[in-house]
Amino acid sequence: MASYDKAWYVGTKSEESGDMQGEIVVKTWKANPSWDKNGDGVIQYVLIKGEPGHPDAEARTTHVTKYITENGIKVQKLNANWDTARAKDIVDAWIQKHGDKIEFIFSNNDSMALGALQSVQSLGYNQGDNSKFIPIVGVDAIPDMLNEIKKGTIVGTVLQDSLNQAKAVVDLSLNVANGKEPLEGTQWTLDDVKAVRVPYVPITLDNIQVAEDTYK
């Protein structure tokens, strides 16, 4: 980017989505002590990973558990990471193997999280009985995921704030087109690689309207 005089980047920090996912886990875990099924104070979790080697998948996988442990909660992984579009089939196998030992499902994206939900529901979980509930968290804040959060079947997701990303692109473009400095009169800042980083937003039922507003 530095080699181009008139080029800037608007986007996010991949690791932040994992941190925000971890924030949701910490907040909801502390608010729901019954989720600690064996009472050991440790989150026994499974994780559905995206494409191996992809920066977003790697960052989300690393940072979700890093954030949780840095906030005083121990974790124990019950599975190897999986790259799969067949999330339901994989979670079916995990449920059969681990059953009620699974206390949380972390997913690198919402599509796989919804596949996990299909799996647990087919086995009697997440259907309104609080004693048979496995919390699930994803990333992307797609409409189907938001609907499940409102139903109470999914705990949360992470919004990539496309609305504010678009605003940043427009603001910088208009300034440059009018011969101004790219940031003049805007709320944005540039990092050391000429990038505007728009923060991710953790989404739960408490602030779901924030995500829904991006689709209006």
Identify the residue ranges that each predicted region occupies.
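Loop/turn elements at helix/coil->beta-strand transitions in domains of secreted/extracellular proteins
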Residues: 4-6, 42-44, 69-75, 99-103, ...
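Solvent-exposed loop/turn segments at secondary-structure junctions
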Residues: 1-3, 15-16, 51-55, 81-85, ...
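Short, hydrophobic alpha-helical segments
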Residues: 25-33, 95, 170-181
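Short, solvent-exposed amphipathic alpha-helices that sit
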Residues: 17-24, 55-73, 90, 115-119
